[in-house]
């Protein structure tokens, strides 16, 4: 069993990192082999919007995203962690998410479980940011079992109660994996899938990899 934590903070040892460590520690205690990836330490180019990944199934860029995609694919559990920057995830996390586009169009990460960790400085709605990352996980095919929100302005300020919430998230992910928990699609999920399939049907000549994926599954 493997678990990977994706840290979207530019700070390697900040509050989001501490909370992610707490969640990963709980997964490790449950028998998972864990790994944490600090996005800012990796070379990840912006998505250029060329569409090659949708047409041919593979990105034309060669950078550290190859390694990160492999880690996610090989993991049974995935946690996304980000501080709130201007009401949303950091630029680093958004760049990572943008480069994961093929998994949103072709959700091949089914059978995995995950969740989100958000740290904020008291401004905004961190639950909405966590909800966004969990919706991203769900779009990839991963079952999001929850999230943990913490408060911190100064690095290391996040408190014991918030660290406990992160640990509980790790425990919840481990339990979901063990029980093979299934999540029924919501009305929003079904509507998003309907919109995606309409897009792919209309532009199948540009999204050949997507078209063939869904055709094989009998949706087109």
Swiss-Prot record:
Record Gene3D superfamilies: 3.40.50.360
Residues that, per the record, bind [4Fe-4S] cluster: 47, 50, 53, 59
InterPro entries: Flavoprotein-like_sf, FMN_Rdtase-like_dom, ISF_SsuE-like
Keywords, in A-Z order: 4Fe-4S, Flavoprotein, FMN, Iron, Iron-sulfur, Metal-binding
Cofactor(s) the protein needs: FMN; [4Fe-4S] cluster
Cofactor annotation comment: Binds 1 FMN per subunit. Binds 1 [4Fe-4S] cluster.
UniProt-listed Pfam families: FMN_red (PF03358)
Gene Ontology molecular function: 4 iron, 4 sulfur cluster binding; metal ion binding; oxidoreductase activity
Family of this protein: Belongs to the SsuE family. Isf subfamily.
Function: Redox-active protein probably involved in electron transport.
SUBUNIT field: Homodimer.
Stated name of the protein: Iron-sulfur flavoprotein AF_1436
UniProt source species: Archaeoglobus fulgidus (strain ATCC 49558 / DSM 4304 / JCM 9628 / NBRC 100126 / VC-16)
Organism lineage: Archaea, Methanobacteriati, Methanobacteriota, Archaeoglobi, Archaeoglobales
